[in-house]
Amino acid sequence: MKKYLVGGAVRDGLLNMPIKEKDWVVVESTPEEMIKLGYKPVGKSFPVFLHPKSHEEHALARTERKNGYGYKGFKLYTSSKITLEEDLKRRDLTINAIAKDKNGNLIDPYGGIKDLYEKKLKHISNSFKEDPLRVLRTARFAAYLFHLNFFIDSKTLKIMSEMIDELFFIPVERIWLETKKALLCRNPHVYFKVLLKCGALKKIFPEIENLFHIKSFYNKNINLGSLTLRALYESSLISNEIKIRFSMLCHNFDKFNSNNKKNSFYCNKINGNLILNKICKRLKLSNEIKKLSKIALDHHDTLYKIFFISAKMVIKFLNDINAWKNPKIIDDLIIISKSYGISIGYKKKSMHKQEKFIKNLYKKLNSIKTKDIIKDGFIGINIKKELMKRRENIIYNDFIIYK
């Protein structure tokens, strides 16, 4: 029995990046021997075991052969006679097919170290095209390693573009898992740029791809898709929360192509929300993500109008986003609005003024408590009326705002 460290741990170690987890390949062994040595079997489709002490995954060397469609259309073979090189060959990219033995020696049969040095994401063989999930994985690695100037090899990108029809066979759960990982990268926008470039975006995220066919109102030479990805990037500089980053992808869903020569698009919140509901339902997203995405769609530009709307509209806005019971929504919306603003050309300094304004406004309005109104003798429907009146008075007396 011999075991080798493989995959991301070797790759990230060579790149001096943090190692998140360690995976091992075991050759010249059998399931019976692994169990006898105390390893716990956990794999359903193929023999994977947990180390009795470290609990790190150890997989018996295996090969695979295409026998169907999609990323599950494979027949797996495992045997004590399968070599390390044969196991590494079934992997997606050369940089993920480097192994390390117990003495620290590197085994690199497919040139992964050279490609790491050249910052290249390159497929190992033509068998790459047999698994459509690799389109998403390669796009994710492009996002993950973008800060190190990695790029996708042109031949690999060409193969990816030839695989897009099989994306249909990937379960939505796997699509969301890869997308979620990509959204948590330092440069999440790169993932969607790669999917756009190889034609996959239209297949799995048609709602986002459609934005690339709508010209911006602010700059006719830029489309809304590009602005959306720019906003996503800006949000990633401020927050690492998945709900905020995904919301940035949805904030332009209410924009549609216009036949009017003066305006490149028109807004329709109702249809925009229908599109949002469709993508959230398809991806089976959490209520938390859905709620913030809806707020981003409906109110991402409200902070830019805050100086020019009436007191009643300000209070309605805060009611709509449920700010009284969920104060954090103000901070989330500020991040969304700032990211949107920067994407369309606002300066950060001017947005700081609006951020300070809305925070101070909310703090004062939220200081009015229903219990104090009841103490003053108001009952029934008059409590709500008095609450509204007092909040309006604060806006009129303490803040410069339209009546």
Curated annotation (Swiss-Prot):
EC nos: 2.7.7.72
Main enzyme class: transferase
Species whose genome carries this gene: Wigglesworthia glossinidia brevipalpis
Cofactor(s) needed by this chain: Mg(2+)
Note: A single active site specifically recognizes both ATP and CTP and is responsible for their addition.
Domain HD: 224-324
A GO molecular-function annotation: magnesium ion binding
Role summary: Catalyzes the addition and repair of the essential 3'-terminal CCA sequence in tRNAs without using a nucleic acid template. Adds these three nucleotides in the order of C, C, and A to the tRNA nucleotide-73, using CTP and ATP as substrates and producing inorganic pyrophosphate. tRNA 3'-terminal CCA addition is required both for tRNA processing and repair. Also involved in tRNA surveillance by mediating tandem CCA addition to generate a CCACCA at the 3' terminus of unstable tRNAs. While stable tRNAs receive only 3'-terminal CCA, unstable tRNAs are marked with CCACCA and rapidly degraded.
Catalytic activity: a tRNA precursor + 2 CTP + ATP = a tRNA with a 3' CCA end + 3 diphosphate; a tRNA with a 3' CCA end + 2 CTP + ATP = a tRNA with a 3' CCACCA end + 3 diphosphate
Protein family: Belongs to the tRNA nucleotidyltransferase/poly(A) polymerase family. Bacterial CCA-adding enzyme type 2 subfamily.
Residues holding Mg(2+): E21, D23
Lineage per the UniProt record: Bacteria, Pseudomonadati, Pseudomonadota, Gammaproteobacteria, Enterobacterales
Protein known as: CCA-adding enzyme
Residue numbers binding CTP: G8, R11, R91, R137, R140
Signal sequence bounds: none
GO BP of this protein: RNA repair; tRNA 3'-terminal CCA addition
Binding site for ATP: G8, R11, R91, R137, R140
Keyword entries, A-Z: ATP-binding, Magnesium, Metal-binding, Nucleotide-binding, Nucleotidyltransferase, RNA repair, RNA-binding, Transferase, tRNA processing
